[in-house]
Amino acid sequence: LRHFGPTMAHEIVMLGTGNAFLPNGRHHSFAIFDGKHIIDAPPTALISLRENGIKVSEISTIFITHLHGDHIFGLPFLLLERTYISDRELSQPLTIVAAPGARKRIEELCEIAYPGSMKKILSTIVWNEKAQGSTKDGWNWNRFEVNHNEFVDPFGYSFESTDGAKFVHSGDSGPCEPLYS
């Protein structure tokens, strides 16, 4: 991922465009923007990042759209890799942005996957459950409800950079008003 000159050229890379069933061998739905912010962490996240030459330690923000397995079951592997391979000192800050209540479920998922192995990294993560905020590099974001299974707290995100770049990620939404406004 590259940034050019004094004005940054933003880049969004779709690291996966499949659904829960991986049609035609496509990786699960997964995106990265500006080389350091990922949207969701599916089971195929680690391989998608490696295939694209992206180091797990360079990820600074993980935005979670909802709590279905095809969107979060890669989190234990990403955090484990970061702990034991790419950021052993846990010196690179990591923020996870998710709906209220998601932290508890994500921590439970990590404990089930690797009991006791991720307590340290989980304690260093900055958890953000607010409906809006900003990244350190100038992306303002807003989380909004979308049309999907209510039991998994489904949300989309709108993003706007301080230089005016904008995009929306809908998660697994069907048509709904927030996507058009």
Regions inferred by a protein language model and the residue ranges of each:
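Structured loop/turn residues at beta-strand edges in well-structured enzyme cores
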Residues: 54-57, 92, 120-123, 137-139, ...
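Active-site metal-binding motif and surrounding structural segment of the metallo-beta-lactamase
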Residues: 46-95
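Short Pro/Gly-enriched beta-strand edge/turn motifs at strand-loop
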Residues: 9-17, 110-112, 137-142
